[in-house]
């Protein structure tokens, strides 16, 4: 399943499980990290993280959870859990989830890290600290770039 299909799968199955109203979100994050230790560039790494949030309202009772695995089995288990949570919660007339809206796409900032600029900026920072504050022993410095994509239904 692609990302949009994963969110649709979650929402469809929440409704099949008996939710009066439901919402699902999938957050995919990529982090580029550059580290300096004792004045030397020592590490460049890329990490990926994903999590899925789901909320349901059934009989004016609410349940919510967040998972970090997005395979069908994990989603199905979380759906069962969130439905149990809703059953066990206290009803509140104020609980609500907005009606479905037309799909939209939003963007802010750069989608990709400029690795050359990251390296150069961190190198300049280390040089600046060493020349301006010679008594300081810069043990560690980290520069990172984060990019997130959120799919919500």
Per-region residue spans from a language model:
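N-terminal alpha-helical targeting/anchoring segments
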Residues: 32-87
């Amino acid at each position: 399943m692609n990302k949009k299909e994963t969110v649709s799968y979650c929402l469809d199955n929440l409704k099949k499980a008996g939710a009066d109203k439901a919402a699902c979100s999938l957050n995919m994050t990529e982090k580029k990290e550059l580290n300096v230790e004792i004045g030397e560039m020592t590490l460049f790494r890329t990490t990926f993280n994903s999590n899925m949030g789901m909320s349901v309202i059934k009989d004016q009772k609410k349940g919510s959870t967040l998972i970090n695995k997005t395979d069908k089995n994990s989603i199905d288990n979380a759906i069962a859990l969130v439905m149990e949570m809703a059953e066990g919660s206290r009803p509140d007339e104020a609980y609500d989830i907005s009606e479905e809206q037309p799909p939209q796409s939003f963007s802010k900032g750069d989608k990709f890290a400029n690795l050359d600029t990251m390296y150069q900026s961190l190198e300049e920072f280390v040089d600046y600290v060493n020349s301006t504050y010679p008594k300081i022993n810069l043990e560690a410095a980290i520069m990172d770039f984060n990019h997130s994509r959120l799919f919500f239904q």
